[in-house]
Amino acid sequence: MSDNKTSLSYKDAGVDIDAGNALVDRIKGVVKRTRRPEVMGGIGGFGALCELPTKYKQPLLVSGTDGVGTKLRLALDLNKHDTIGIDLVAMCVNDLIVQGAEPLFFLDYYATGKLDVDVAAEVVTGIGEGCIQAGCALIGGETAEMPGMYEGEDYDVAGFCVGVVEKEDVIDGTKVAAGDALIAVGSSGPHSNGYSLIRKILEVSNADLNEELNGKTIAAHLIEPTKIYIKSALKMIAEHDIHAISHITGGGFWENIPRVLPQGTKAVVDGNSWEWPAIFNWLQEKGNVDTYEMYRTFNCGVGLVVALPKEQAEQAVALLNAEGENAWVIGEIAAAEQGEEQVEIR
């Protein structure tokens, strides 16, 4: 073997371990700010340890995982990475609250072809902010630099969350009955769903992202982070007999509301009970999207739909609004015939 042969390193192959270590140093403060008393140890171990909160008698663990879809492409195009982490946390923890679970801890996965420490630190800082809003601890994650797998400095993110709920307090939809009221909790925009259609609308309409709509640019409307409902929803759950909660994500009203309804019931939604936020009207007009498809793809201004006894509805709405949400009665539960659609929008 020749002594003149070049000695290759991992960095020569496109993986910079030093950059990864620099990122870990940058995010230690973010992780610390999210800490809960149940968390044992710090980041950097092979696994993270977390005790169950002592207030639970028969705790059930509830888990969820999600990403932010092609909203990432918009963030990359706008070079705006500081809120995409909030979206990531929101998509995971809002799924947990559907079953009444309090989020305990969160882990993230960040994959890229070439690690840009500044961009990654922005993303993780957003994840930390999302965890603070949700009251859960960021206890670990994985940063994968994978040359040849992603174009340039493109990246993808995924989140994993574990929460806890008292066994007797699980919200599973079995108590939903005809006569229940339906409450809507407003969204902050499209959240993290429908962005492939949004990007197609932008393409075919040749829209200007700097165009102003209600005092904000179209870009600002579309990159607005997903709302995290945990703290207000937990308070509502503690004070009211909640029968079901639906998180309006991909599939919109038609797909998500039936997921929490028992057979023989349907949700009757009053389409006149709210006005769509302006960005949804803009998207519908620019893309010539029919109303059925809008409700199938987007949340149309509704992030959560809650079923509860009719006599508790107004108090629950008042509580949510006092907590800073925009909530209103959106409809009711009715009996459904066999084979009938479980969502009706009037």
From Swiss-Prot:
Q: Which Pfam families match?
A: AIRS (PF00586), AIRS_C (PF02769)
Q: Which Gene3D superfamilies match?
A: PurM-like C-terminal domain (3.90.650.10), PurM-like, N-terminal domain (3.30.1330.10)
Looking at the UniProt record for this protein, which Gene Ontology cellular component terms does it annotate, in alphabetical order?
cytosol
Pathway field: Purine metabolism; IMP biosynthesis via de novo pathway; 5-amino-1-(5-phospho-D-ribosyl)imidazole from N(2)-formyl-N(1)-(5-phospho-D-ribosyl)glycinamide: step 2/2
- SUPFAM superfamilies, A to Z: PurM C-terminal domain-like, PurM N-terminal domain-like
Which Gene Ontology BP annotations are present?
Answer: 'de novo' IMP biosynthetic process; adenine biosynthetic process
A GO molecular function term, named singly, is: phosphoribosylformylglycinamidine cyclo-ligase activity
Q: Which reaction does it catalyse?
A: 2-formamido-N(1)-(5-O-phospho-beta-D-ribosyl)acetamidine + ATP = 5-amino-1-(5-phospho-beta-D-ribosyl)imidazole + ADP + phosphate + H(+)
Q: Tell me the compartments it is located in.
A: Cytoplasm
Question: CDD domains, per this entry?
Answer: PurM (cd02196)
Q: Name the major location.
A: cytoplasm
Q: Which UniProt keywords apply?
A: ATP-binding, Cytoplasm, Ligase, Nucleotide-binding, Purine biosynthesis
Q: Identify the EC number(s).
A: 6.3.3.1
Coiled-coil region? none
Kindly report, in one word, the top-level EC class recorded for this enzyme.
ligase
Q: Which PANTHER family match?
A: TRIFUNCTIONAL PURINE BIOSYNTHETIC PROTEIN ADENOSINE-3 (PTHR10520:SF12), TRIFUNCTIONAL PURINE BIOSYNTHETIC PROTEIN ADENOSINE-3-RELATED (PTHR10520)
The family line of this record is:
Belongs to the AIR synthase family.
| Name of the protein this chain belongs to | Phosphoribosylformylglycinamidine cyclo-ligase
Q: Which organism is it from?
A: Aliivibrio fischeri (strain MJ11)
Q: What is the organism lineage in this UniProt record?
A: Bacteria, Pseudomonadati, Pseudomonadota, Gammaproteobacteria, Vibrionales
- Gene giving rise to this polypeptide: purM
